[in-house]
Structures are given as C-alpha cells and as structure tokens.
Design a protein with these regions (language model features):
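Conserved nucleotide-sensing/catalytic segment adjacent to the nucleotide-binding pocket
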Residues: 135, 143-203
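Extreme N-terminal, non-catalytic leader segments
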Residues: 83-107
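Walker A (P-loop) phosphate-binding loop of P-loop NTPases
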Residues: 113
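ATP-dependent NMP and nucleoside kinases share a basic, alpha-helical "lid"
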Residues: 206-247
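Hydrophobic positions on the alpha1 helix immediately C-terminal to the Walker A/P-loop
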Residues: 119
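C-terminal beta-strand-rich structural cap/linker in extracellular carbohydrate-active enzymes
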Residues: 56-82
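Conserved lysine of the Walker
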Residues: 116
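Carbohydrate-binding surface patches
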Residues: 2-39
C-alpha cells in the first residue's frame, strides 16, 4: 500500500510527486504511480534520474517506484516539461512538411553540455507520439579508436605537434570514421530496411557491428558533436544547439 500526492503548476510545465510506501511485501510486483493534470503530448524530464516520459505515459501507465527495502520509505519525483524540445519539434515538423521526403536525416550537434542527448531523445518521443517511425543514432560510436585509446592518441599528437597538430586531428578523418557513418546515412536514404550499425564500448575489443531493422523508420536523428562537419554527408536538416558556459 502507498500514499501519494502531487502538485502541478498552473502552466502544467512542472509537477512534484511525493510517495510514501505504507506496507511492503516480499517479492512484490513493481508498483506504478499515475500522475494527473499534465499535457498528454508534452515530454517531461524526471530531474533526478534524467529519464524522459510523455505526459500521456505518466498519466496512463505511471512512473515505477524503486524496489522496496523497508516500510515507510519515502520518494519524491520532480518533473519539468522540455519546452525547448516542443518548440524545436514544431519547427522541424514545418520543415518536413515543406520538404516532403520518404526518409529524412536530422542532425543535432553542438558543444559538450549543449543538451544534444536530452533534446534528441525528446524529439524522438515527439515523432513517435505522432506515429512517425524515428531512430536515434549516436555518432559517438564512430571514432576510429575507443575513448581511452583516442585520448592517448590526442595526447601523442599534442606532444609531437602542439596545438596546431591537435587542431588538425580533432574532429577530422584522422579521428573519426566518416566513411563508415556516411555509409549508414546513404543506406538509409536508399530505403534499405536493414542497416549495419557500429557499437563502441570503452575497453579494447569492444567494437562490434549489428544488423538493425529500419523498416517503418522515416526519420533518422543523428546526435553528435561532429554532426555539422563538412566531412559528414547525407544530412537533410542540420540543427546547431548553442549554449553558454553557464548553461
């Protein structure tokens, strides 16, 4: 048994949910708490976990509570509407309406901390909410080396050639396998239903390829720092995300 209460802002853009578990049983099934008063079509960020939910999902399915450890556990969840994602989706949708294509590649790029991952995930949810098949692809799987080895290579280049040499390495074909990711975008535009994607881990040997089903997918979202590079081909709509150091 649980007791739960919530408050929602007048604009329906913020919600705070408090839950107390009154009774707990061994091997208890996952408990969901359904919210009320949200915008069904909006996407909300749960601030502590960083997970995203549509308003409809929060109101109809609810948010799962963590596995219990004792009775009278208390939880609190804070939700914030991702308004920037909604605004971006409206603009992207207008562009798509003006440029009718069977398949569209949208690149979201910007510096570290600019919100690429958060916005891309929310944008994907907006497309899915409208019944549009959308796949989110991370460009972080396409350097030549795993992160640890790439950091070592950056240091080697800097020690041997200084800042000029490092500028000639970062984000270029020397660091990034642009040919590989360009093949992915080309295959998507060609209408292929199965495309080989690359997956990169953090340790030696953790680079693999996987056949991925793209049937029913009409929008490919590419989220990547280098998504605006001249060496990247096949992007229909580039979206640059600008952020200040404070942000």
């Amino acid at each position: 048994e649980i007791a739960a209460w919530m408050s929602v802002s007048e604009q329906q853009d913020h919600a705070l949910v408090s839950v107390v578990r009154l009774m707990a049983e061994a091997n208890q099934a996952t408990v969901y708490v359904r919210l009320r008063g949200l915008k069904p079509d909006a996407v909300y960020l749960e601030e502590q976990s960083g997970r995203q939910y549509s308003g409809a999902a929060l109101m109809h399915a609810g948010i799962p509570l963590p596995p219990f450890t004792r009775e009278y556990e208390a939880y609190q969840f804070a939700f914030t509407e991702l308004k920037e994602a909604g605004t971006l989706y409206e603009k992207v949708q207008k562009w798509c309406d003006r440029n009718a294509k069977n398949r569209v590649v949208i690149s979201l790029y910007g510096g570290s901390g600019s919100g690429k991952t958060t916005l891309a995930t929310a944008l994907q949810q907006y497309f899915l909410n409208d019944g549009t098949g959308c796949y989110l692809l991370s460009g972080d799987d396409y350097p030549h080396r795993i992160p640890k080895r790439n950091d070592e290579e950056r240091m080697r280049v800097y020690k041997e050639t200084g800042e000029d040499g490092l500028r000639g390495y970062l984000g270029t074909k020397k660091e990034i396998d642009f040919d590989r990711i360009n093949e992915v975008l080309a295959a998507f535009h060609e209408g292929k239903d199965t495309i080989t994607l690359r997956h990169m881990g953090r340790e030696d040997g953790e680079i693999s390829s996987e056949e991925t089903d793209f049937s029913g997918i009409s929008v490919l979202l590419l989220e990547w720092t280098h998504g605006g590079s001249d060496d990247l081909h096949g992007v229909d709509l580039p979206v640059f995300l600008e952020s200040s150091p404070e942000e």
